[in-house]
Design a protein with these regions (language model features):
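Accessory recognition modules or surfaces
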Residues: 87-105, 147
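Long amphipathic alpha-helical segments
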Residues: 1-95
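Short helix-loop-beta junction
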Residues: 122-137
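A general structural motif
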Residues: 113, 117-118, 137-144, 169-170
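Short phosphate-binding/catalytic loops that engage adenosine nucleotides
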Residues: 45, 132-134, 183
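Conserved hydrophobic helix-helix packing surfaces used for dimerization/oligomerization
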Residues: 105-108, 158
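Cofactor-cradling patches in redox/metallo enzymes
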Residues: 142-195
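Short glycine-enriched loops at secondary-structure junctions
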Residues: 56, 112-115, 194
């Protein structure tokens, strides 16, 4: 659902919308970016289009522009922080418009220590919550925290999110750490650009 049909709509100018979001988050003004998102919603863009399509494309573009030296690491970090703040600000609106299932699965999403790509995991956590799951997102953790969590909770799935090829050894070690504590009773899945 790209357009909210209950609102007066303007023609969706996909590339223009993306450029406006990109520009506002890179200008380090959260207030301007928040106003832009509200305006896009007022003009009929659905929150699903914005959070599920626009934000991931903008995040990828920011990463590409860092790799190609069009933006500095600091500029990308600040822009992604703005994007993540927008994501958390508008997530309640996103979740309010979706019907949750009757299944109340409990899922743990782990972003391995050292992984610097977190936007995908945050987006996946939002999507899973919208489906009625109880989703725990674990970032920048200590092994003791992770161990206490997996031993203290009944989990239906553990997801590992990674976007870096250099994380293979850490992911294997994390998987071994998890299975040595929970056995094979809880499935472990890997997702992200690495896959």
């Amino acid at each position: 659902k790209l357009i909210d049909k209950k609102k007066n709509t303007a023609k969706v100018a996909f590339n223009s919308d993306l450029q406006k979001i990109y520009s506002t988050v890179t200008q380090k003004s959260f207030t301007a970016a928040e106003t832009l998102i509200k305006n896009l919603i007022d003009f009929g863009r659905s929150i699903r289009l914005i959070l599920d399509t626009y934000f991931p494309i903008v995040a990828r573009r920011l990463g590409d522009h860092w790799v190609s030296d069009k933006l500095t690491f600091a500029e990308v970090t600040l822009a992604l922080a703005n994007l993540q703040l927008l994501n958390s600000k508008f997530e309640p609106l996103y979740l309010s418009g979706l019907k949750s299932s009757q299944i109340r699965s409990k899922i743990l999403l782990v972003v391995p220590t050292g992984e610097d790509h977190t936007f995908g995991a945050i987006s996946v956590a939002r999507k899973l919550r919208s489906m009625g799951t109880q989703t725990i997102l674990l970032l920048d953790y200590q092994n003791k925290e992770l161990e206490d969590l997996i031993l203290g909770e009944t989990l239906d799935l553990i997801g590992i999110s990674s976007g870096n090829n250099f994380m293979t050894e850490k992911i294997n070690a994390l998987s071994t750490f998890l299975t040595s504590r929970i056995g094979k009773k809880t499935p472990i899945a890997l997702g992200g650009n690495l896959v």
